[in-house]
Amino acid sequence: MKKADAPSSEPPELKALWESWLADLGWQPSEQQQQQLQQLYPLVMAGNRTQNLTRITDPIDFWEKHLWDSLRGLRLLGSWEAIQAQPWRGIDIGTGAGFPGIPAQIALPQTRFTLLDSTQRKIAFVQDILQRLSLTQARAVAQRAEIWGQDPQERGSYDIALARALASAEICAEYCLPLLKVGGRAILYRGHWTEAEAQTLEQALELLGGKLIHVEAFTTPRSRGVRHCLLLEKVAPTPPPYPRSPGTPKRQPLGQSNRP
């Protein structure tokens, strides 16, 4: 299958952004990684013509809000030098068009990512992208997170879990924690973050065997948008009832008075 080339008429500002990873993220991609990241924009835009993958179509916004944002969250796991060498199992829950999972797979080549989404058409698109970018260590799966988290082969088997633009933090925690090993970590990508949200999340984590380790606030490099990334750790086995049946986490988010 023919690989997509990077756009030949990129705006000058975008060309500068492609060279700014080290300053913005403390990360320097290899030539192959840079090429893979640059190929994502034309591939996603081509897919966007036939299905609703993203509303972000400006190339500079795409770099910041999909690529940079996806990679920025990984910094919570440790130094780039350390995490790039880890033979982890990772999962991106609710991957959509492949974010943050595809950029994460490019940046962490030793990790084997599962990109999970309940929509078959989106997973077919992601599978095509993985093939075009030769990301053979990753897989894309069409399944609900609630079902995947109760699968005996998947439950408790992942080192890291990512959830971005998916649902409220306590819902994301119910999707992520059952899939993690004890000691595994989840990164939840958020916009603004409030004390009320933190309290609700803490209540959910008590039920799920998790702990909120760190909340990191930052701004995006171009639009100066406010972002927060939450680092969770699984400190005890998740009780068998979680995740609850499909749809229940969203209908009845976990909280102090919400036990199975």
Swiss-Prot record:
One of its GO terms (cellular component) is cytosol. Residues 236-260 are annotated as: Disordered. Signal peptide: none annotated. InterPro entries: rRNA_ssu_MeTfrase_G, SAM-dependent_MTases_sf. One of its GO terms (molecular function) is rRNA (guanine-N7-)-methyltransferase activity. The keyword DNA-binding does not apply. The keyword Methyltransferase applies. Its EC number is 2.1.1.-. Keywords: Cytoplasm, Methyltransferase, rRNA processing, S-adenosyl-L-methionine, Transferase. S-adenosyl-L-methionine binds at residues 94, 99, 117-119, 145-146, 164. It is found in: Cytoplasm. It comes from the Bacteria. It is an enzyme of class 2 (transferase). Disulfide bonds: none annotated. Pfam families: GidB. Residues 237-246 have a biased composition (Pro residues). Specifically methylates the N7 position of a guanine in 16S rRNA. Belongs to the methyltransferase superfamily. RNA methyltransferase RsmG family. NCBIfam families: rsmG_gidB (TIGR00138). This is Ribosomal RNA small subunit methyltransferase G. The lineage of its organism: Bacteria, Bacillati, Cyanobacteriota, Cyanophyceae, Synechococcales. The gene is rsmG.
